[in-house]
A protein has these predicted regions:
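Absolute protein N-terminus
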Residues: 1, 17-19
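Sec-dependent signal peptide recognition
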Residues: 1-8
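N-terminal signal peptide c-region/cleavage motif recognized by signal peptidases
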Residues: 10-15
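N-terminal mature ectodomain segment of secretory-pathway/periplasmic proteins
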Residues: 19-101
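A structural detector for beta-sheet-dominated domains
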Residues: 26-28, 40-42, 52, 76, ...
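Glycine-centered positions within short beta-strands or beta-hairpins
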Residues: 29, 175-177, 202
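Gly/Pro-enriched, hydrophobic low-complexity segments
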Residues: 50-52, 66, 180-225
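Solvent-exposed helix/loop surface patches that form functional interfaces
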Residues: 84-193, 206-208, 214
Length: 225
C-alpha cells in the first residue's frame, strides 16, 4: 500500500541546513502516524538527511497495516552520494544501500547488487521533495526499492486556489502564485501521481497521493524545527 509513495524546484526554495520536517500522516483524513526528516551538514560540508516514518492503520483497536521506514542520505554537488534505507511493511523487510565512487554508483538490495556507471547515471536523485531543482529532475530513485523511474512535473494552481468540488481554476502566473497560499506541483510517474505542496517561500509543506480507489494518503507539516 505504501510502496507507491516512495517510488513517494526550480524555485528559490532551499531549506536551511539544520531543519527538521515533522509531518503528520493521514489516510482518508484520519491520522495514522508521522514522518520526521532532519537535514544537517557534516564536517565535509555535505548535506546529511535522516528520516523515520511510522504508520499504523487500525480498526476497532486492531492493527491491519503497520509500516516503518528509516532512511539516511548524503548529498554533495547537488547529487546523491550515498543512501541507506530499511523498511518493514506489514512484517516484510526491504533494504537498500547506495554508494558512489569515481566510476559510478553501487546499488544493493536484498534481491541483488547492481553497478551503475557514470555514463548510465551521472547524478542520482531520490524523492527529495525539499531540495532546490527537485522539479527539474526527469528520473528519480525509489528509496524503498532502489527502482529508477522516469518522472515529469506539472505546476498546478496554488493550494488555496484549488478547493475540492470546484470548477477548473485558471493556471496562475508565477507572480500570482508567489502572493498566494503556496505552490502545488503534480509529480507523475509511470504508475502514480503525487501532488506536492510548497509554501509561498518554497518550503515543502505536504503531499497527497491516491494509493488505491478511495484511499488517499496525505502528509501535513505539523511544524518546522
Amino acid at each position: 500500500m505504501i510502496r507507491a509513495l516512495f517510488v513517494l524546484f526550480s524555485l528559490n526554495a532551499f531549506p536551511s541546513l539544520a531543519d527538521t520536517f515533522d509531518f503528520e500522516v493521514l489516510l482518508n483524513g484520519k491520522p495514522i502516524g508521522h514522518h520526521k526528516i532532519t537535514l544537517s551538514v557534516d564536517e565535509r560540508g555535505h548535506q546529511v538527511v535522516q528520516g523515520e516514518a511510522d504508520y499504523r492503520v487500525k480498526l476497532l483497536g486492531i492493527t491491519f497495516f503497520a509500516y516503518q521506514h528509516q532512511h539516511r542520505e548524503i548529498w554533495d554537488d547537488n547529487c546523491l552520494q550515498s543512501l541507506s534505507t530499511s523498511t518493514q511493511s506489514n512484517g516484510e523487510l526491504a533494504q537498500v544501500t547506495l554508494t558512489s565512487s569515481p566510476e559510478g554508483y553501487a546499488l544493493t538490495t536484498l534481491k541483488e547488487p547492481k553497478a551503475l556507471t557514470l555514463d548510465e547515471q551521472p547524478c542520482l536523485w531520490s524523492y527529495a521533495y525539499w531540495r532546490k531543482d527537485f522539479t527539474s529532475q526527469r528520473q528519480l530513485m525509489n528509496g524503498q526499492t532502489g527502482q529508477m523511474s522516469p518522472v515529469s512535473f506539472e505546476r498546478r494552481p496554488p493550494i488555496e486556489a484549488n478547493p475540492l468540488n470546484s470548477g477548473p481554476v485558471p493556471e496562475p502566473s508565477l507572480g500570482e502564485a508567489l502572493e498566494s497560499a503556496g505552490f502545488r506541483y503534480r509529480l507523475v510517474t509511470d504508475d502514480q501521481t503525487i501532488n506536492v505542496d510548497y509554501s509561498p517561500a518554497g518550503q515543502w509543506v505536504g503531499l497527497q497521493v491516491d494509493l488505491a480507489p478511495n484511499r488517499v494518503l496525505t502528509y501535513r507539516l505539523r511544524k518546522m524545527l
